[in-house]
Amino acid sequence: MSALGSGDSNHGNSSGLDPLNSYLSLPILISSKNEIEATGIPSQKTTAQQAAVFLLDSGMVGETAPMVQLFMQKMKEEGFRSMLKNQFIKHTDACVDDFLKGDVKSLFRNTKQLSKVVLNHFKPMIPKKFHQLWALGIESNAFYLKLCGSGGGGYILGFTENIDRAKKALKGHKIEVVYTF
């Protein structure tokens, strides 16, 4: 049972974070297993070249159970566990810190690295039709993508320093801007 809930589902126990987040209508910062708090985010700004966080609709329904099974299988590999600790968690934590501090330059540097790590090590969890698009974002610096949840479909989280440039690069794809700064 997790610290926040024990709702059984097809992939194990629920953390209860999604309902808590919905109830509070605030971002939640998880510092450790026992340190969970509501937090603020930097205020939104209107600039000529607006940075943004967006959702990219994959148009596919992702099934959680196979993605979790794949992840658990990969966790048996020492190299994967090492990458998770030394790259994935490192860049994820840096992105959160940069975002909360408002350090946009560092945020996008770390987001690019995180996007590369996900593409290189979580590729089976990314819908195949998005592999090239994911790489294009990294190579062009127009946008960077990150899996939402277990992957396999649903929404993909996107970050861009220039939303107009990202929209052009993502033409033909359904995106929804959720935050600008």
Model regions and ranges:
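C-terminal nucleotide
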Residues: 3-13, 17-150, 157-181
